[in-house]
Amino acid sequence: MRRIGFYLFIMAVFLLAPLLALPQKAVPAPAAVPTPTPTAVARAAAPYRAVWVSYLEWEQVDFSSAEAFTQAIGTMLDNIQSIGATVVLAQVRPFGDALYPSGYFPFSHLCTGTQGQDPGFDPLALLVDAAHARDLQLEAWVNPYRIQAGQTPALCGASPARLHPDWVRYTDTGAYLDPANADVRQYIADGVGELCARYAVDGIHFDDYFYPTTDPAFDAADYAASGTALARDDWR
C-alpha cells in the first residue's frame, strides 16, 4: 500500500509540474492616486461702494499748490475710506474743461478761478496716485455735454464753445455741446481716449448730464438732416 501511495504521489507531481511552469498572470499594480494640483483660492471681488466727488466739492478744495492739493485730497480720501467706500467717482470734466492738462479741453476754472489757467501741477495725476495708495479705485467722471450752467464758468478762448461755436446749443439753463453732431460725439470719444491713455483710471463715469432740453427747436435742423424714421424722442 505504501508503494501504491508513493506512485500516486509521483504521478501527481508530474501532472502538476506543467501547470506550475506556466507563466503567472500579471496582477496590475494599483493605479497611483494623482496628487491634486493646488489652486489659487478665488478672491471675492471688493464690493462696489462709491462716493461722488463733484465740482461742488472741488470748490472747497485748495488748488493753490501741489502740496496744498495733496494734503486736501489726502484728508478727503481718508474720510472716504473710513466709511467703507471702495470707489471714488471724481468729476474731472465738469464744464467742457478739465482737472488735468488736456489736448482737447482747457484747465477748469475750479483749479485757479479762471478757466484755461494752468495751476502748475496735474491734479488728476495726484488724485489717482493718492486713491490707489489707499486701495481705492478712481473713476474719471465726465459730463460730456455741459459747457456752462447759466453764465458759469466764464469761457476762455480754448473752450470748445469758442473753438467750435457751431457745435454749441443754448437753452435757458446754459450752453451745451450738441449731442446730435457727429463731430461732437467724436470729440467726446477722443477726450475719453486721452484720459484712458494718460491716466491709470479704473473706469470712465458719465453722469450729471441730460439731453439739454425737450424743446424741438433745439435740434430741429439735426433731426431733419438725419433722415431718420424714428420719432424725435427715440432718435435723441
Model-predicted segments: where are they?
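Aromatic- and glycine-enriched glycan-recognition loops and surfaces
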Residues: S65-I83, L110-R134, W235-R236
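Structural recognition of the beta-strand scaffold that forms the well-ordered cores
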Residues: R49-V53, V87-Q91, Q137-W141, G203-D207
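Aromatic-lined carbohydrate-binding/catalytic grooves of carbohydrate-active enzymes
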Residues: I83-P119
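Aromatic- and acidic-residue-enriched segments that line the glycan-binding/catalytic groove
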Residues: Y100-G113, R146-D172, Y209-L230
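Ser/Thr-rich, Proline-interspersed low-complexity disordered segments
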Residues: P18-A44
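Catalytic domains of carbohydrate-active enzymes, especially glycoside hydrolases
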Residues: Q71-A98, R198-G203
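Sec-dependent N-terminal signal peptides of Gram-positive bacterial secreted proteins and lipoproteins
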Residues: G5-P23
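Active-site-adjacent "subsite" loops/lids of carbohydrate-active enzymes
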Residues: R43-Q71, V128-D129, E139-R198
